[in-house]
A protein has these predicted regions:
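A short beta-loop-alpha structural element at the N-terminal edge
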Residues: 3-16
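Conserved acetyl-CoA-binding loop-helix of GNAT-fold acetyltransferases
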Residues: 74, 83-96
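A conserved beta-turn-beta hairpin within the catalytic core of GNAT-like acetyltransferases
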Residues: 64-73, 82, 101-104
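Conserved GNAT acetyl-CoA-binding A-motif
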Residues: 91, 98-110
């Protein structure tokens, strides 16, 4: 049986994650995805999650926490896996991890084009 697996991003996932972001139209000319990933890895890499299905990355979430509020960026689910509960499963995991670090509120950033 095929199973979705949520795990922490590692640099070996970089190419697949950027490909996912491109599929989901999350990359804009003013945002270099490699620089965004590098910045995230310098701060709190345990709050950068991916979803794998048959060893292929089909979801991602880059999460920030400043001690007061959580922020969610690059929330993506491969279009072929949308409407299957993957986004909801990922959001539950995000909420769980932020609650564990004492976060009382989450801000989600969504572009009009998304």
């Amino acid at each position: 049986m095929n199973k979705y697996n949520i795990t922490i991003f590692e640099d070996k996932h970089r190419t697949q994650v950027i490909d996912l972001w491109e599929k989901c139209n999350l990359i804009k000319s003013w945002n270099d995805p490699n620089k965004d990933i590098d910045r995230k890895l310098k701060v709190n890499d345990s709050l950068f999650l991916i979803v794998e299905f048959n060893k292929v990355i089909i979801g991602s979430a880059m999460i920030g926490y400043d001690g007061h509020r959580g922020s969610l960026y690059y929330l993506a689910v491969d279009p072929k896996h949308q409407r299957k509960g993957v986004g909801g499963m990922l959001m539950k995991e995000i909420e769980k991890r932020l609650i564990e670090v004492g976060c009382p509120k989450i801000n989600i950033f969504i572009r009009n084009s998304n």
